[in-house]
Amino acid sequence: MRNKSLDAAKAVAACLVVFIHVSFPGQVGQIIKVLARCAVPFFFMISGYFCYYEGKTAEDKIPSKILHILKLFFISLLFYLVWEYIMKFLSGEDTGEWLKELTDSSHLKEFALYNSTSVVRAHLWFLPALIYCYAVDFFVEKWKLRKAAYCCIPVLLAMLLWRAEFCRFFGGFYHTMEYRNFLFTGFGFYLTGQMIHEYQDKMYQCFVQKHTERHIKWLLIVGMAAGAALSILEYSFQNAREIYLGNCIAVICLFLWLVLYGKEKKISPILAEIGRKYAFLIYLLHPAVADVMKKISHHVGIDSSLCYLWLRPLLVYGITLGMIQGVFTLNMRLKDCSRR
C-alpha cells in the first residue's frame, strides 16, 4: 500500500522550493528560505526511496526511470531555452552573446562535471543530477555494492557540509556548483532514502518489540524541531547558505517519521494527489510563472507593494499548480473524446 504521507510531503516540498526562488520579504522571508532548504534533499531521498527493489528487478526498473527523467529534462531544457531567449529579447539584452555562452566549452564542462545549468536556468540542475544518481545506482545494483554504497552516506554528507558550510570557518571556499551536484547534494540523500526503504520494516518491528515506538516517534519530532532551530541559528551566524547541518538533521528525521508513522495519519487526498502527480512539474515550471508575474506587477505598479510581496510566493505556487491541473484535465478530456 502506497504511503500517501510521502506524496503529501512532496506537495509541501514543491511549495518550499517555490519559497526558495520566490521568497517572502524581509528577515521572515529569509528564515522561511532557510527552513525550505530541506526540500531538495527531500526530493533526492524520495527518489532513492522509490528506487529500492528486492531481488534483481532494479536493473530492469532503473533504465526506464533514467529515460523518463531524461525526457523530462530535454523538454524542460528546450522550454527554458526558448523562454530565456524571449525574456532577454523583451528586456533588450544581447541574445546573440547569450547564445554563444550556451555552447561555451567551460559551461559544457560545468554541466558534465557538476550538473550546472546556470547558463539556462539554475534550478534545472536537479534533473541531470538525478539521472546521474540513477546511473550510478544501476551499477551499484549490477555489481551488488549496495551495502558498500550505504557506508559512503556519512562520507558524502560530511563532504557536502564541509564544502557548503564549515570550510568557511577555516578560510576555505567552494563555488556552489562544486557541492550542489549529484555526488554531494544528490547521492548521499538518495542512498539515505533507499536505505530507509530497505530497513523500514526491521526498524519498526524492532521498536514494537522493545515497546519504544512511541518514544522514537517523539524523538523524531524533537529531531525535526531541533534541526529547524539549528538551521536558523546557523543562518544567524553565517548568513545565507545553500544547505545547513540543521536541514540535514530535520529532513532525515522527517523522512523517518513519514515512513514509520505517516501511514497512521489521515492525509488530505487532494494534497497527496498534488504531490504524486504535479510536484516535479511545479518544481520545473514555477520560475516561468514568477517571470510573468514580475513583469505584470511592474507594469501595473504593484511590484514594491508589501501586500503583493507577501502574496507573491503563494500566487506563484497557486497559479503554477492551476495551470498544470488545467493542462492535465484538458489532456484527459481530449483522450476521452478520441476514444469515442
Model features per residue range: what roles?
Residues L145-D201:
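Hydrophobic, aromatic-enriched interface-forming segments
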Residues D201-Y278, A288, K295-S297, I302-L309:
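Alpha-helical transmembrane segments and terminal signal-anchor/GPI-anchor hydrophobic tails
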Residues R2-S5, P25-I32, S118, F170-R180, ...:
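Membrane-interfacial loop-to-transmembrane-helix junctions in polytopic alpha-helical membrane proteins
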Residues V28-V40, L113-P128, F166-F189, L230-C253, ...:
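Interfacial loop-to-helix transition and helix-capping segments at the boundaries
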